[in-house]
């Protein structure tokens, strides 16, 4: 039996540190791949056979925000259904494709629609796109979502910079560890990178776009939360609630991606108002917020790209 920190165990088992394995070019591993990485490698090979593009920033678009990708300088697009073994979104407002192109001079890959745990996928499937974008070459992951406002000071249409998170869904790291991506027990103390948050915060200030900042909590869905559940998550310290994002941030952090995230407060959570919640309301609010969202994301991505070495 091997004892010691996970990184030392990995070094003794394989002759490679987790960082060496993680930073190695796709397809260069000579020892046995984990099943997770083997599947990921097949998706990557399918991508490379169709698309010749290496992004610097990966962007995930949430409910009602997907049209942002149509406004960038597009070089190529790839439907999820064209990638063998890749999960496909079934939710309205999620187109289900990768868009490759430029935001300013920054090379980006955009997920125009994500998959969710509540759709019946395994958590490994839910975070597969995040891991694939890491293999594509992305160094930064910019997560967006439509979320319910838990903080009484928030209003529908606000933007919230995610400072931290609470994940009430199963961890995407449960089960076999993909040593090729990261260590068994990754640190999460800076899961939303402080330096990247500073960039987005300063960008919003210069653009005169109001920006809240708070804690995001992921529940499983697909049902909206009960008033009692909202009281619970507020007690836990959450400012906004949704059904995605936190698991993606965990997988990204594990794989060595720097993460930043913004929630569009699409509605006030159950119990704050007497109005019933609907998915149509989420999309309607996101549509109204879209112009400012596009402005903030565009300028933030440009500055994030420039900040990379």
Please tell me what each predicted stretch does.
Residues 270-309:
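His/Asp/Glu-rich mid-to-C-terminal helical/loop segments that flank catalytic regions of hydrolases
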Residues 30-188:
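Metabolite-binding pocket within alpha/beta catalytic cores that recognizes anionic/polar moieties
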Residues 9, 18-29:
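Short, low-complexity intrinsically disordered segments enriched in A/P/G/S/L with frequent Arg
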